[in-house]
Amino acid sequence: MPRAAPNSINATLNLSSSLGKTVHLPAPAATIFVADPTIADYQAPSNRTIFVFGKKFGRTSLFALDENGEALAELHVVVTQPIADLRAMLRDQVGDYPIHVSYTPRGAILSGTAPNAEVVDIAKRVTEQFLGDGAPIVNNIKVAGSLQVNLSVRVAEVSRSGLKALGINLSAFGQFGNFKVGVLNRGAGLGSATGSGGTAEIGFDNDAVSVGAVLDALAKEHIASVLAEPNLTAMSGETASFLAGGEFPIPVLQENGQTSVEFRRFGVSLEFVPTVLDNNLINIHVKPEVSELSLQGAVQVNGIAVPAVSTRRADTVVELASGQSFVIGGLIRRNVNNDISAFPWLGRIPILGALFRSSSFQKEESELVILVTPYIVRPGSNPNQMSAPTDRMAPALGTPPRARAAISTDAPSVKGDLGFIIE
């Protein structure tokens, strides 16, 4: 740090972008430099006058030294955008909502209340574009009503060979990457794989066809297996995640020759980010994944067998109303088995044994079907309305027959329309 000259200037210089101020030095300057010329710069009409102007949002420092190396001026330059212009732009883009913006030496602060998360996101993006890349923004805008989204997910493994045997076709009209997305039209049913009738297509459900009921029926016939049924609730705009599985160790060879252990996750995982839009529409970024340990591709590390991981995942963004469903499918796994049938003892005779044995290849295909249903929910204000499934059950075992006959309780039932509590 250079030694300060007599009557040196040490101050904070506040500038707006594309505007400047004049600084008069107490003595002629021999050297002038700016720490970050991309934020602010200068022009010197004379050796005692500096014109400092802002270029973009940020903070930097300006130093002016005399011929002896002593500091004539040490300025902390803070460059901001005209806050009145930003406030006017916010009103034009998001409407007349109580959203406030203020500047700090390090960035901008957004505060106030918005009707939904979409307005919050627009206000943040407008501020970022106005201030420029890299400008720190603190978002303190609150969403009115504390909207939350409950995501009901069913992850099922469906046997494709069983579906073909029953003449069921789970098809879709559109394919994106390795998974398919379609629409369940009103009146559509389960058609054959080759027929031209209605099919249970992978996509949105408009209450005419319940894919969940189809999965239940297939599970009873051992054609489908439900792997997980997570229910997650998250604030609008926040991230929620779920994992049903475990972790397995992986030996990792270090540079010094020693071996450390890292753990990798496997199983059924889900991550989603819901955003509540206008008219109760929900924008969902959902990333389901199913992974399992596999001997195919396994390796040996220092004599330790490390299994491979077979992974099927999808990543998509959709918009739908509360209570509607969509399905992700097309994630297929294939297994090929070679079955050998032979007559006892005779099948082992050289050359002639081939006449007494036969081999057949069996190809098994299974499809991963992920059913997702979002609901807009709010916290319950009355805890007495919340109950567990066993709250209305009365024990019958361990009581005398007469007392058992006297037990009376109301049959369990759901509360509210469709099982939801309406306040």
Swiss-Prot record:
Residues 75-145 form the BON domain. Transmembrane segments: none annotated. It holds the Pfam family T2SS-T3SS_pil_N. The keyword Transport applies. Keywords: Plasmid, Transport. It comes from the Bacteria. The lineage of its organism: Bacteria, Pseudomonadati, Pseudomonadota, Alphaproteobacteria, Hyphomicrobiales. The keyword Disulfide bond does not apply. InterPro entries: Bact_Secretion_Sys_Channel, BON_dom, GspD/PilQ, T2SS-T3SS_pil_N, T2SS/T3SS_dom, Transpt-assoc_nodulatn_dom_bac. One of its GO terms (cellular component) is type II protein secretion system complex. Belongs to the bacterial secretin family. Involved in the secretion of an unknown compound. One of its GO terms (biological process) is protein secretion. This is Uncharacterized protein y4xJ.
